[in-house]
């Protein structure tokens, strides 16, 4: 952030002037590269090398500059986001492989990993690939009697690339809500789809429709992103049904996801099954866990759930569960 660049030296000092000049030069360059509505700028090798040298040469300027210099030298993923309102830019860094940052500590020490998932098989495989032996795996039971989640995937459901997909899922969702007595949750990380769905339903159900707000009554309709729901579900009554229009495969439009995929591809790894699929299963698992309390319904309107092998694998990972072939009014 800008404050991390200008907080220490007097404005008149030569070092300060050099840093200010570099900041403004990069700002101009990044805004000239801006494409349509995208707020993210991917950096090429030349730009990364320039930033690496700059932060290394000025690492004594602040602890923040030193940390950035170290991160770049270790090959962290980096990208820039643009703030159109304030005409500023922010520089982001994130490790592609978090475990590699602490592996030297794990080799000679005992460690305990905690997972939010009921059974985290992907992470166990990940540790074994890194030659980190697991001595004991403990799966704790829930503090309530787990009921089977009822999974409904409409037959012959469209794929997301079908031009009629959005209209189709909106029409189906409206029918599913008509007979619902309890809370209906619509989950989507696609911002446009989430807003469109909330707007369409609000024109029918008015104030019953909420956009990422805590519901106060049983029969409300909540539209939210996965992250918002995971962070707030503890204070919300278990939904009667959760409607998922798109399986939560991480978007490669997000810089960290795109850079991780590129990194894994360069290493000839199966980037989909080793990165995107585990991330999707983990996000889905955490999002639907409240349904185990009341045997709630999970409705998946993404045709890939049946038509793709990995989609069927995601369905199989939801346990305990029971797939149903139809929905009955007030069932």
Role assignments for model-derived ranges:
Residues 1-201, 304-313, 324-331:
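Conserved coupling segment at the C-terminus of the helicase ATP-binding
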Residues 188-192, 208-218, 223-231:
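Conserved helicase motor
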Residues 107, 130, 205, 237-238, ...:
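Short, structured coil segments at secondary-structure junctions
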Residues 128-129, 199-206, 216, 234-240:
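Short, surface-exposed basic-aromatic patches at helix termini and helix-loop junctions that form
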Residues 157-158, 218-309:
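Conserved RecA-like P-loop NTPase helicase motor core
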Residues 137-142, 213-215, 226-227, 246-250, ...:
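Short, acidic/turn-prone active-site loops that include or flank metal/cofactor-
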Residues 98-103, 171-175, 211, 229-232, ...:
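Generic recognition of flexible, low-complexity loop/linker segments
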Residues 114, 187-189, 212, 244-245, ...:
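Generic beta-strand/beta-sheet core signal
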């Amino acid at each position: 952030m800008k404050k991390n660049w200008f907080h220490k030296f007097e404005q008149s000092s030569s070092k300060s002037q050099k840093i200010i000049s570099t900041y403004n030069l990069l700002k101009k360059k990044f805004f000239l590269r801006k494409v349509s509505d995208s707020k993210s700028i991917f950096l090429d090798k030349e730009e990364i090398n320039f930033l690496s040298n700059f932060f290394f040469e000025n690492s004594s300027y602040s602890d923040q500059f030193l940390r950035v210099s170290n991160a770049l030298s270790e090959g962290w993923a980096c990208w820039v986001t643009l703030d159109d309102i304030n005409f500023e830019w922010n520089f982001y860094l994130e490790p592609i492989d978090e475990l590699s940052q602490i592996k030297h500590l794990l080799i000679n020490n005992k460690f305990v990993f905690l997972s939010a998932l009921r059974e985290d098989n992907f992470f166990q495989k990940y540790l074994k690939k890194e030659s980190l032996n697991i001595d004991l795996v403990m799966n704790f039971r829930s503090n309530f009697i787990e009921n089977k989640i009822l999974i409904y995937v409409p037959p012959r459901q469209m794929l997301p690339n079908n031009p009629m997909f959005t209209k189709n899922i909106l029409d189906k969702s409206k029918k599913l809500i008509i007979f619902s007595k309890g809370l209906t949750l619509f989950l989507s990380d696609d911002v446009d789809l989430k807003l469109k769905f909330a707007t369409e339903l609000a024109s029918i159900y008015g104030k019953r429709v909420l956009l990422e707000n805590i519901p106060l009554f049983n029969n409300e309709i909540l539209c939210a992103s996965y992250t918002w729901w995971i962070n707030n579900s503890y204070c919300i009554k278990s939904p009667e049904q959760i409607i998922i229009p798109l399986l939560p495969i991480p978007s490669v439009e997000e810089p960290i996801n795109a850079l991780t995929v590129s990194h894994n591809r360069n290493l000839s790894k199966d980037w989909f099954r080793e990165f995107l699929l585990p991330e999707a299963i983990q996000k889905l698992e955490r999002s639907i866990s409240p349904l185990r309390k009341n045997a709630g319904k999970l409705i998946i309107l993404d045709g890939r759930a049946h038509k793709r092998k990995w989609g069927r694998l995601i369905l199989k990972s939801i346990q305990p569960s029971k797939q149903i072939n139809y929905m009955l009014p007030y069932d």
